[in-house]
Amino acid sequence: EIHERLVGSEMCIRDSPETYEFLKDDTVHNYVATFYAQFDAQFTAEMYAALKKQGMTLPELVTLASFVQEEAGNSQDSNVAQVFRNRLAEGSPYPRLQSNTSSHVQSDADNNYLWNWVAPYYGGWDDIPENILAAYDTYSCTGLPAGPISNPGLAAIKAALEPQPDEEAKNAYFFVTDLKGNYYYAHTLAEHNANCKTAAAVNKNLKN
């Protein structure tokens, strides 16, 4: 299972995260076929048409959606998706996702694909091959990482495909959250730094 997550495999791309019932002696082939059938039932022809119109591949969409899911709850899916799409847009001044859910930032190891999955798989951070680190560290790789970091649900996939953001997120390149679950969006780095201070103040008050 860990290996499948590491390589951003077809299993991650088409494994719909739902509750399934299987017989105890069922086969792996049937497990996978069931996962694929569920994904294909949810991903409509209209969604495929929208994907084609945008020039995205299914693996790219699911990779983006996996970051949306890890960074947001359903209420913020579209806003976070819009921020990431703004960063990925042609001519963007910030062409990297810079998501702490897959990065070298150790302080966010509680929800960090590289620290929680990749590093243990290879025996430690220092043992991660350079090509793997380069492919999944969103602070160093330009554009999308090599594959998904989780199996996103339908809500995250829809948001990644056709986000419907609030006004505050439409032109944003940055966001930060506080421990109360508030999201702060910004267009400029200066605005983002101010939001970080606001979020830090909220967090400090909660801890006092």
Show where each model-derived region lies.
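Positively charged, low-complexity/disordered segments
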Residues: 1-8
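Bacterial extracytoplasmic/cell-wall-associated proteins, especially those involved in peptidoglycan
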Residues: 9-10, 14-208
